[in-house]
């Protein structure tokens, strides 16, 4: 490694980084970018975001005394360079793997990871709490939050900015704006103004002038407006953050290491809430990622010398099946509306967005708004379909109850990534949606076992006049033939195999695992289809005819489908041995989906062993 990366091989902590002379920092950035590309291409992971913040990461650790100073990364997709510089360089080949490095900043992994993250827009709220604590303790530590131009659109981020500005706490928020490339002329002007507005002389005059002119409101107001006009001339968005109580600087070139260091050194000594706006290019330094930052956001293993990502498998994903269904329905009904909170690609809605732009809404990272926006459309007689990941629906729970379910509005929730998701770990597992939706009145919840059933359930939801959730897993579908769509009978399961002694009640896409066990031991196998309402008559019949009932689901056992079956059996007074298989009471770490199923006993082998242990 020393031969290929002579500078990076010397950096085992930010302390080593701070020993480098400034003229070595850009060569270090070049090595860091090359190493990041090499390691991610060999292991899979998030690439384009990290490539875009190499200079920023180096500058932050060079200027700030991390981990004494607190550095917080929002979401964490961009934190790979941070991990490399903070003692985890030689472990990068394990990232997102079982027992390897966590895919996001993780408190248990390193003292440099101040906040465990994975979902967006949390950094400023947590950073403000940390900054307030530092002030109360007179610790002298600084707090820096790095947030992207996508994450800052969320309401939570602006709630935190509004609060921070109102209490005037010392902290720095850095907006990593990678939406468009930097204009050379505007970038140069902004770099100059950044040095001016963050310089010690300007800071002294600014604060001193406020005191001197405090008794002369008209002059004080003139000076304030003049300063804002100069800043607004370059970046009108700056006046918004100034209005919220922040001292806004920027935008500046986020790939100019010298300018970043100069600006950050000045800002480190400024008091009150500071806002630095930097412009970066996602995928910087790797042409394929620069040209296709969305495609190279999260990548599988690939040949970085060719820049070609491997072709997807022939079997479509559940997300693709959903997108195709949405297009098919939009051809029939102009009142069907597709809604996504900034997950167009992940939710399979690219084709729909192109073919039906008037029926497609990307509301940005705003899950709460997405749900209530759908409620409004439903009130007006439209058929809204909210396509959302299970773990992100958690952020809109009040809206699901207050704005949709209480009013019994026909909003369809297409819940992607339900169950075990794999390499993204604890923050992204879809483990809780059955539990938190099942207790909500007026909700209908369906759990398809394959893509054909998924289509039938989505169509069934379309025909209903009440809120409906269809939950389906991450990854490739089963490859079954798609049948013409028809509405299912609500709350009715389907006996797939009649056996004896043991009945397996399957909820969702683990059906094939259950089928292997049922065929080996001649057990009864049931595709329950509906988690709410349950097929109560079928459950009672199965309880009468079998010695053991087994429920199988990709959801937390507490409050899930198995709990629903148990509650019903208790309600009718049938005391029957019941084995509930699902996700236990802990957060599931990163691994492949297959590894997690095996660890949790949700593959065929684990299901079989648990059933046999009950007999």
From Swiss-Prot:
The keyword Magnesium applies. Mg(2+) binds at residues 149, 178. It is an enzyme of class 2 (transferase). One of its GO terms (biological process) is thiamine biosynthetic process. Binds 1 Mg(2+) ion per subunit. It comes from the Bacteria. Belongs to the transketolase family. DXPS subfamily. This is 1-deoxy-D-xylulose-5-phosphate synthase. It comes from Glaesserella parasuis serovar 5 (strain SH0165) (Haemophilus parasuis).
